[in-house]
């Protein structure tokens, strides 16, 4: 009587090719960030309407290239997305500098306006870094859908204990948004651990 060899455990969804991720959560977050930029006072921005208009144009361009599900890697689409996130991040850094300059220089006299501006800059920063994490983890959403890269840049709890998640679980934009939120509030990793140098440096920059 021969021993039967048990079938090997199937690869978890985050390590194999999948149908990809809908991009609408990331797109909605981008629209919220752009709206936050538009409520900032003009003295905190270089061009109050120009930068949001450029960002909206790049977002529309990106959606025209792929309007729904990111199920494969596209170099052209990724370049547009990275450029958009870069513009968003630089514009928000400029606004943060303007806010600090007004506070230190004693030019800020309206407390309510300061609170609204600070909240808008903080939310935009959180969304911008969530997008960086989403675009860079294992090569971006397109590469993740192809299941090419074996090792994650961010270690989520579901990866360490697959019994805590459905078999088809894989990280989506909301997971990266929560990662960015906890990093911005706790100033340290919480449930998600950075595994690579770029991930650690990006969290440090945030």
Pin down the residues of each PLM region.
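Pore-domain transmembrane helices of cation channels
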Residues: 103-142
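Structural signature of hydrophobic alpha-helical transmembrane segments
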Residues: 25, 46-59
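Short, hydrophobic transmembrane alpha-helix segments
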Residues: 37-49, 68-71
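Outer-pore turret/helix-boundary of cation channels
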Residues: 129-176
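Pore domain of cation channels
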Residues: 170-206
């Amino acid at each position: 009587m021969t021993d039967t060899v048990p079938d090997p455990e199937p690869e978890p969804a985050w390590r194999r090719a999948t149908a990809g991720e809908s991009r609408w959560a990331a797109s909605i977050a981008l629209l919220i960030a752009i709206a936050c930029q538009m409520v900032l006072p003009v003295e905190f921005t270089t061009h109050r309407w120009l930068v949001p208009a450029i960002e909206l144009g790049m977002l529309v361009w990106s959606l025209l290239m792929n309007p729904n599900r990111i199920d494969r890697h596209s170099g052209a689409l990724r370049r547009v997305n990275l450029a958009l996130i870069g513009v968003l991040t630089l514009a928000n850094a400029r606004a943060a500098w303007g806010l600090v300059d007004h506070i230190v220089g004693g030019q800020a006299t309206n407390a309510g306006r300061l609170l609204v501006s600070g909240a808008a800059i903080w939310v935009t920063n959180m969304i911008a870094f969530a997008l960086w994490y989403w675009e860079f983890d294992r090569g971006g959403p397109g590469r993740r859908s192809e299941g090419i890269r074996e090792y994650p840049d961010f270690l989520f709890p579901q990866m360490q204990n697959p019994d805590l998640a459905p078999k088809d679980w894989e990280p989506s934009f909301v997971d990266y948004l929560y990662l960015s939120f906890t990093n911005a509030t706790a100033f340290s990793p919480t449930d998600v651990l950075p595994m690579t140098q770029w991930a650690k440096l990006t969290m440090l920059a945030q």
